[in-house]
Amino acid sequence: MGRRAWTLQCTAFSLFCAWCAMNSVKAKKQFVNEWAAEIPGGPEAASAIAQELGYDLLGQIGSLENHYLFKHRNHPRRSRRSALHITKRLSDDDRVIWAEQQYEKERSKRSVLRDSALDLFNDPMWNQQWYLQDTRMTATLPKLDLHVIPVWQKGITGKGVVITVLDDGLEWNHTDIYANYDPEASYDFNDNDHDPFPRYDLINENKHGTRCAGEIAMQANNHKCGVGVAYNSKVGGIRMLDGIVTDAIEASLIGFNPGHVDIYSASWGPNDDGKTVEGPGRLAQKAFEYGVKQGRQGKGSIFVWASGNGGRQGDNCDCDGYTDSIYTISINSASQQGLSPWYAEKCSSTLATSYSSGDYTDQRITSADLHNDCTETHTGTSASAPLAAGIFALALEANPNLTWRDMQHLVVWTSEYDPLANNPGWKKNGAGLMVNSRFGFGLLNAKALVDLADPSTWSSVPEKKECVVKDNDFEPRALKANGEVIIEIPTRACEGQENAIKSLEHVQFEATIEYSRRGDLHVTLTSAAGTSTVLLAERERDTSPNGFKNWDFMSVHTWGENPIGTWTLRIADMSGRIQNEGRIVTWKLILHGTSSQPEHMKQPRVYTSYNTVQNDRRGVEKVVDSGEEQPTQEGLDENAQASQSPSGSGVGGRRDELAEGAPSEAMLRLLQSAFSKNSPSKQSPKKPPSAKPNIPYENFYEALERLNKPSQLKDSEDSLYNDYVDGFYNTKPYKHRDDRLLQALVDLLREEN
């Protein structure tokens, strides 16, 4: 073939490709039933053309004079082909200078294009922070994040906000914390100096504060550990748990530098042993009051408190006066499974929930650790409270003028019910808010909270009012085992007075109760709107004869309700211990709220699906308040229904279903691992575990049954087995709680072999 012929062929092929490409581009266009035209004659001429040619005149195009938009009366709304004949007829009109059929144009927002969440940061443990990004690898897991990333993408990262962690010290020279360390938010109350550095020991006992601070303020993009929720905030440490704690010390740390510190995060409290009743002393209480009145230049300090880890001990955080305070935001935990973890306590004062550790195989929380190290094993409500504090720091950066009560309202109004809806105990109160004794108003949603706090739209809540309701003629009433005292409390909520209340916030029932066995008491309060709240559930380990002395039982479950009407209080003992006796000596009902409805509550709260992908696991029927345990699943056997027993050995002040057939292979591997601990030959890493150890299935299930039988636990101070669960959780596949419980199960199996 000659050079000329080859050149002609190449040219022809190129022209053909160009023609194909041009037609391909045209084919991709979506033409719409709209024509733009330039008509110098103005609106009268445009109207005449429309009438003559079969168009509807849609009007002038923006501010362009003599440019009009038309819609043809007999043409489809969208088409892949242009209507050239219609365009030609319009453009051929002498009154039209130019005409063109409109088509869809693809446009992209010119924001910074972001990689996947996994690639946002170079910190090595970022991809393990499952609670900040949806990293689930299993379809059965619910959506797992606190919606923090959308807030960061707005440029809100905690700048200008100061948080102090009240704990056992802070390793402030840690390379993932140092850049955000604030010495003005720090003090050592154990050694009375300005250096909160923790005391090192062989077991790293004082790691707690550093871990909590890291969750809040770990530096981003520094190739170290992970990323803090408010990674540009300033963080300080108060060292106070590594020594003697007094009321004076607590008052000093709660009121430390309130003009500088915005948020105080505390992951500790009285002993979570299921038998302690204790709250702030006189001085600490005054420090709380001073903080909310004078802190942050009068806007009020934000106090965040972990709700407690006494679940296994059958504890109830209504007996903890720190989480039960109207001045604190009490935060509970949810596991990676979206369930209430084994250590979580139930009470009517919990405001909201954050993520933390759960069952033995669940992921835990990532943070900084002692000796400039990192950890992925931070646990308990200790880990939940700092996450909440970080989210509140984001809100304060967005709106520094938020008051302490604004923050509580924001939490109530934006926390999510949907991701935790698989759990029992949810109820809708008289104001239309979903609430639960385990989770408060639900899982924190950082984006929703920050969006609502936008200073351009947020209206600060009205002035706080307090109305006290009591019966001056009340005579002490006797209570015995299997008995109940019912008190009807009619109230007009101080109507007509300066302190009248029409919209509730906190409700306190202050009482003095003398009783021979305090832990057998059950207290329920029903509001005028019909919301029933358990103020105190039974605590099997609480054998104290001391009762309650002017104790404030606090509830947030009636938030937003109108209190006018008759309230009903029930105090009962259904233990069957016939020797029990006592009396209700005094009581008063304290209503906290506002005389007018807050602006954001004038429209009802609308709940939307948090996780549309993972709704197939839903199916929880409506149940009564979680404190009034009622099984919600069919087919519960007697042992499962009865499994609410006392718990085991006390813990410190820090707030660190049987399927049919064979046990799961994962369960058997865990058991085999535990069996191997006492045999050196089986500990060799070179010998992989067999798929299924030789454990008779009937023994396996018998051991599980024994773990859940109340008869094995009654009056036992040293029990390790109590899961503090109701019938609902007993129908779930059994999950190991920790190494001690695993070993206990193994020991039971060995007894039979």
Curated annotation (Swiss-Prot):
- Known cofactor(s): Ca(2+)
User: Known catalysed reaction(s)?
Assistant: Release of protein hormones, neuropeptides and renin from their precursors, generally by hydrolysis of -Lys-Arg-|- bonds
In this UniProt entry, which cysteines form S-S bonds? 225-374, 317-347, 467-494
Task: Output this protein's name.
Answer: Neuroendocrine convertase 1
In the UniProt entry, which residues are flagged as the active site?
167 (charge relay system), 208 (charge relay system), 382 (charge relay system)
Name where it's found.
Cytoplasmic vesicle, Secretory vesicle
Protein family according to the UniProt entry? Belongs to the peptidase S8 family. Furin subfamily.
Instruction: List all annotated glycosylation positions.
Output: 173, 401
Which region is the signal sequence? 1-27
The record places propeptide residues at 28-110
In what residue span(s) does the Peptidase S8 domain sit? 129-450
- Known InterPro entries for this protein? Galactose-bd-like_sf (IPR008979), Kexin/furin (IPR034182), P_dom (IPR002884), Peptidase_S8/S53_dom (IPR000209), Peptidase_S8/S53_dom_sf (IPR036852), Peptidase_S8_Asp-AS (IPR023827), Peptidase_S8_His-AS (IPR022398), Peptidase_S8_Ser-AS (IPR023828)
Could you state one GO biological process linked to this protein?
A: peptide hormone processing
Gene Ontology molecular function: serine-type endopeptidase activity
